Design a protein with these regions (language model features):
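RNase H-like DDE/DDD metal-dependent nuclease/strand-transfer catalytic core used by mobile genetic elements
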Residues: 107
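Short, conserved phosphate-binding/catalytic loop or strand-edge motifs used
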Residues: 110
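Short, glycine/polar-rich helix-capping loops at beta-to-alpha or helix-loop-helix junctions
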Residues: 123-128
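Alpha-helix capping/helix-boundary segments
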Residues: 102-103
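Aromatic- and glycine-enriched glycan-recognition loops and surfaces
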Residues: 43-52
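Surface-exposed amphipathic alpha-helical tracts and adjacent flexible/coil segments at the periphery
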Residues: 1-24, 28-40, 54-55, 59-71, ...
Length: 336
C-alpha cells in the first residue's frame, strides 16, 4: 500500500483554514460559496470571484479543490446556482459536491465532475449504481457500519460499478468531526423550531442545547441528569483507520468548515500521518500520540460513530468544546 492510494480531504471554511489544510498535508479541500452550501453562514465563506484565486492556490500546492453546492434548491435559486457552476467551470474547480439533482445536472452540463454528498444517504449498492451515472465519487451514509461499507466496496470492484469517467466509483467517508442528530445530516429540527433549515445551510444547532422530558398525559416534567439528549459526540476514526482502508474507503473526509484553522491544521496533520503509517506498517505504535493531539483542538468528546456497529449515538455531557488546551483570544490579525 502507498499513501497515494488514499485521498485526505480537509475543510476550507476560510482563507486561514485553506492554508492550514494545505500545510497539514491534505490531498484535497472543500469549500462553499455564498448561500448555496451547507455552511452558508460560516464566517469565512468564499465568493464566486474568489474561485480563480482559490484554485490557483490549490493547483500550486498540488491539491484538488471541491466546491460544495449541497443544499436543497428552490426554483428561484436555479439561475444563481447555474451562474455559480459556470464560474466554477471557468476557475477549473476539480469537482462539485452536490445532492440536489438540479445541481448535479447543472455541474454535468458545464463539464464539472460530480461528487455525491452524504445528504443523499447512499446506503446500498443499488442506490450507488443508480447515482453512478452522474458522478465519479460518492460519500456513503454516515450510519453504515464497516461491514456494510465493505459489501458496497466489493460490489464496486466485482460488478463493477463505474462512474462517469469510466473508472470504478470512489467511496468517500467522513473520518473526523461533528455528527448531526439527523440521518446523514438531514435534519428539520432547526426549521420547525426557528424557521431556519439545516438542509439549506442555516442550522441553529438546537440539538446542542439541554432538554427536559415531559409526560404529556400527566403534565409531569422531568429534568434529566444529562440534558444533552440530542447532541452526539464528535466522530474520531484514527484509532481504527486501518479498518476503514481495509473496508474499501479511498477518500477520507474531515468535517469542520465552521471550525478554526488550528483545528484544521492539527486534524489534517494527524490523519495524514496515520495514512502514511498504515502504508509503511508503523500505524499501531503511533495511535496514542494522535489521540492526545486531536484532543487539544475543538471537540465535543469523541466516539467511533456507527462504523464499528454501534446502534445508538454517544451523547455529550457538557456544552461547547472539551479540548484539553484552552485558547485565549488576544486580537484580530488585519494584515500579514
Amino acid at each position: 500500500m502507498r499513501r497515494s492510494d488514499w485521498e485526505l480531504m480537509a475543510p476550507a471554511g476560510s482563507e486561514e483554514a485553506l492554508s492550514a489544510a494545505i500545510e497539514g498535508g491534505a490531498d484535497s479541500v472543500y469549500f462553499g460559496v455564498g448561500r448555496l452550501n451547507m455552511r452558508a453562514h460560516a464566517a469565512g465563506n468564499f465568493r464566486a470571484d474568489d474561485l480563480p484565486r482559490v484554485m490557483d492556490r490549490c493547483r500550486a500546492a498540488g491539491v484538488k479543490g471541491y466546491l460544495t453546492v449541497n443544499t436543497v434548491l428552490y426554483d428561484e435559486e436555479l439561475a444563481e446556482m447555474k451562474d455559480l457552476m459556470t464560474a466554477a467551470a471557468k476557475a477549473r474547480v476539480s469537482a462539485v459536491i452536490a445532492s440536489d439533482m438540479a445541481a448535479v445536472l447543472a455541474a454535468r452540463e458545464v463539464g464539472l465532475p460530480v461528487h455525491l454528498s452524504t445528504q443523499l444517504n447512499i446506503s446500498n449498492t443499488e442506490a450507488l449504481t443508480f447515482y453512478a451515472q452522474y458522478a465519479e465519487t460518492a460519500v456513503l451514509a454516515r450510519e453504515l457500519n464497516l461491514n456494510q461499507v465493505r459489501c458496497i466496496a466489493d460490489a464496486v470492484r466485482d460488478k463493477p460499478i463505474l462512474g462517469t469517467g469510466g473508472e470504478a466509483m470512489r467511496l468517500e467517508m467522513f473520518c473526523h468531526g461533528a455528527l448531526c442528530m439527523g440521518m446523514s445530516g438531514r435534519c428539520w429540527m432547526s426549521l420547525h423550531t426557528r424557521g431556519k433549515s439545516a438542509n439549506r445551510g442555516e442550522c441553529l444547532q438546537n440539538c446542542r442545547r439541554t432538554y427536559n422530558l415531559v409526560d404529556r398525559e400527566r403534565g409531569t416534567e422531568l429534568a434529566l441528569e444529562n440534558g444533552y439528549v440530542l447532541s452526539p459526540k464528535d466522530l474520531k476514526t484514527i484509532d481504527f483507520l486501518d479498518k476503514m482502508t481495509a473496508a474499501g474507503v479511498t477518500v477520507f473526509k474531515i468535517e469542520g468548515r465552521a471550525r478554526g484553522a488550528d483545528y484544521v491544521r492539527t486534524v489534517t496533520t494527524c490523519y495524514d500521518e496515520a495514512l502514511k503509517a498504515i502504508a509503511d506498517g508503523t500505524y499501531d505504535a503511533k495511535r496514542r500520540a494522535w489521540d492526545d493531539r486531536l484532543a487539544t483542538v475543538f471537540n465535543r468528546g469523541f466516539w467511533a460513530g456507527y462504523y464499528l456497529g454501534a446502534e445508538t449515538a454517544e451523547i455529550v455531557h457538557s456544552y461547547g468544546s472539551c479540548a484539553t488546551e484552552k485558547k485565549v483570544f488576544v486580537g484580530r490579525l488585519v494584515n500579514y
